[in-house]
Amino acid sequence: SGGSRAYLYAPSSVEIVSGTQTKDVKDTRMAPQGLLGARIYTVTELSSAYPAELTVRASWVAEPQTQEQERYAQAEAVYREFVFRNYTAVDKELAPVLQELFWADAQEDGDSIYSAVNRVRQVLSQRTETASDGTLSADVLDLLTGTGRGNAVLYASAAVQALRSRGIPARYVEGYYVSADMARSSASQAVTLTAQNAHAWAEVYFDGIGWLPVDVTPGYYFDAVTLQQMVALPDATHKTAAIDDAERDSSQAEGGGTTGKSPLQETV
């Protein structure tokens, strides 16, 4: 059946939503206003050539040059305090396991988000396998210390806990995965999303920037060598637009950016 009109399905890099009135549901997601929700709307988004973990904040964030920049910096600083109070808690049962598996041999002065994410991916890829037959680990603890059979939900959940245990604010996100190939092959036609396209990932808070998506599910991210090569390349940001029709459970996209994926998100 079609997607729920109570939710606004948009890429994580959304810039503008037009065609419907929206509201913020606390700091977790946007939602359409009105009892009937949204049927058709247009989303404009900014796709970067870099994956999120390579994002670097603008220099003016530390030293604002205009009143607008100053207002942004002040508001972000207030919200950042809220983020660190509410998105760094770790499950007590998992805490010692996370420390042993992910950070026992890490540097004491703390890792950058980039290196921490790479560490999480490395540990998960070495200790677990994707459960293609549907036989999953019971929970994150079982994934890390027991059967080691995961899917996107378990990988994202483990990553959130692991990053939080390193002092990095993170949260769990569910949505749909639209690959660049899907977007290109559809051209101006509809892309139909079903349960087969359901996905989960983590969002990590970058100081001065905000929440950005980070995927740790094997097969859904660039390897460490490719990431290092990307650092030397100039970034290019592309603006694309997509139309969502929740009643038909479809999405139309013009271009797919250059990131290789365009997740449509609901944050929980």
Please provide the spans of the model-predicted regions.
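Beta-strand-rich, non-transmembrane domain signature
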Residues: S1-K23
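Hydrophobic, helix-length membrane anchors
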Residues: V43, A58, T259-V268
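Short, contiguous acidic/charged loop-to-helix segments that flank catalytic cores in large enzymes
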Residues: D142-G150, A190-L193
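Hydrophobic/aromatic-rich core segments of domains that either
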Residues: V153-T240
